[in-house]
């Protein structure tokens, strides 16, 4: 058992999520084509400040994340501060925890408040897969470095003649794990095979996610937490996530072919998240500061946990490790929760984790616990759909989930919710939030 956690300031004040906002999420090279992550981040933070009538000078710290790094803006957090009217003295730094990045930025702001260093802060994350750093081959990079040391034409020629045509080709960002060479999709295929996750079940989960997300949009549930964007060249408004299948039909999913194991695989473009562009942010305050400024919090952070597991097998099983720690720290069980959202990187990964939550064998052999975390009640699970439908701008997903969960809990009259996500590198996050 993990010791109980107290997420309060030294004076016993809770850490409040006062507001949250995100851009619509866009499939790569669509509505946000050509818009870098730093501009997406500035866009959503500025809109959140304006929407909630927050004086930018009140912000004491901003922690923001980005997974697909841009060399020209390595500290996206500081660029957001400088681009949104905050004080030049506002502290800002950037974090990266793969798909759990904005859970990390949220926790960092919370911990600054717990230490008494700040009372108002912003956390979030943004990513653009449409504006990615295109590199050069290692041979060309070395040659370009060597060229700087040459003086004569002959010396330059001797450096360049070692290059082949292949060395001159651009190198796109890596999609595989550095340590294993495996892509996330290959890991999802492995998990599907190892845990007997059928193609039919994966397609059903994807269809469910799209259907619930479409229903949430149609019922107006997301309108208050998704801004209208006007990306360059500013000719049209972008208002809704463009990956959601508003006319999703289960039979349509069966038509797609596997992507990562073309002969025996079950993971397709329809039951996996697409490459996505977008940004999200949350405004956080200590309980007393929110009250003094006249804000009613959306909710509070009750507990959180991070986990790291093996990358060679079941690399995306992290929620099954992080969740029991977060529950212990909150003094809760799975049955105590009102709602659950698990990030859907792949339907296969999500279904494998659902299985392991309910497995005594997994708990005993992998977690060193006597009993399973518990069987998930699907009536509480991803009730508005999740990443399979909305898309997954890596660093933006965590704060998207936090805002969406708190708003839905409030619509239901309050309660507590679990948020959990797997991440590249065998990492994972889990957070429990609560409302009044």
Swiss-Prot record:
Gene Ontology, cellular component aspect: cytosol
InterPro entries: 3-ketoacyl-CoA_Thiolase, Ac-CoA_C-AcTrfase_FadI, Thiolase, Thiolase-like, Thiolase_AS, Thiolase_C, Thiolase_N
Localization (cell): Cytoplasm
Reactions mediated catalytically: an acyl-CoA + acetyl-CoA = a 3-oxoacyl-CoA + CoA
Pathway: Lipid metabolism; fatty acid beta-oxidation
Record-level Gene Ontology MF annotations: acetyl-CoA C-acyltransferase activity
Keywords: Acyltransferase, Cytoplasm, Fatty acid metabolism, Lipid degradation, Lipid metabolism, Transferase
Keyword Glycoprotein: no
Cleaved signal peptide residues: none
GO biological process: fatty acid beta-oxidation
Active-site residues, Swiss-Prot/TrEMBL: 99, 392, 422
Main location: cytoplasm
CDD domains: thiolase
Primary role: Catalyzes the final step of fatty acid oxidation in which acetyl-CoA is released and the CoA ester of a fatty acid two carbons shorter is formed.
Summary of subunit composition and partner proteins: Heterotetramer of two alpha chains (FadJ) and two beta chains (FadI).
Family matches, as NCBIfam families: AcCoA-C-Actrans, FadI, PRK08963.1
Entry-linked PANTHER family: ACETYL-COA ACYLTRANSFERASE FADA2 (3-KETOACYL-COA THIOLASE) (BETA-KETOTHIOLASE)-RELATED
Protein name per Swiss-Prot or TrEMBL: 3-ketoacyl-CoA thiolase
């Amino acid at each position: 058992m993990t010791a109980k956690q107290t997420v309060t300031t030294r004076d016993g004040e809770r850490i409040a999520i006062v507001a949250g906002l995100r851009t619509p999420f866009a499939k790569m090279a669509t509505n946000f084509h050509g818009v870098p992550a730093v501009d997406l981040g500035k866009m959503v933070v500025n809109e959140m400040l304006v929407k909630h009538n927050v004086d930018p000078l009140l912000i004491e710290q901003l922690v923001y994340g980005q997974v697909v790094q841009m060399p020209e803006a390595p500290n996206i957090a500081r660029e957001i501060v400088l681009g949104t009217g905050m004080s030049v003295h506002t502290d800002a730094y950037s974090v990266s925890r793969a798909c759990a990045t904005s859970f990390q930025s949220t926790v960092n702001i919370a911990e600054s408040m717990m230490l008494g260093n700040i009372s108002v802060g912003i956390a979030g994350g943004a990513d653009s897969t449409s504006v990615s750093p295109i590199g050069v081959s290692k041979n060309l990079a070395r040659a370009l470095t060597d060229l700087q040391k040459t003086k004569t034409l002959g010396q330059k020629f001797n450096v360049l003649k070692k290059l082949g045509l292949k060395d001159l080709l651009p190198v796109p960002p890596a999609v595989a794990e550095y340590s294993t060479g495996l892509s996330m999709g290959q890991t999802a295929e492995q998990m599907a095979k190892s845990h007997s996750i059928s193609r039919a079940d994966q397609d059903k989960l994807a269809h469910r996610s799209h259907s619930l997300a479409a229903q949430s949009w149609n019922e107006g549930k997301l309108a208050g937490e998704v801004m209208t964007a006007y990306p360059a060249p500013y000719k049209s408004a972008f208002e809704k996530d463009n990956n959601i299948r508003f006319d999703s039909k289960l039979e349509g999913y069966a038509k797609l072919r596997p992507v990562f194991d073309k002969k025996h695989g079950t993971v397709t473009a329809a039951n996996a998240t697409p490459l996505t562009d977008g940004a999200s942010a949350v405004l956080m305050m200590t309980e007393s500061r929110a009250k003094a400024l006249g804000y009613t919090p959306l909710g509070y952070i009750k507990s959180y946990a991070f986990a790291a597991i093996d990358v060679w097998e079941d690399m995306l099983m992290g929620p099954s490790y992080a969740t029991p720690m977060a529950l212990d720290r909150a003094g809760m069980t799975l049955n105590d929760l009102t709602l659950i959202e698990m990030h859907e990187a792949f339907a296969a990964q999500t279904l494998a984790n659902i299985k392991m939550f309910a497995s005594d064998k997994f708990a005993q052999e992998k977690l060193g616990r006597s009993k399973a975390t518990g069987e998930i009640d699907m009536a509480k699970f991803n009730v508005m759909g999740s990443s399979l439908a909305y898309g997954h701008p890596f660093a933006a997903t965590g704060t998207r989930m936090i805002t969406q969960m708190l708003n839905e809990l409030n619509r239901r009259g309050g309660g507590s919710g679990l948020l959990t996500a797997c991440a590249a590198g065998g990492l994972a996050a889990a957070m429990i939030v609560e409302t009044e």
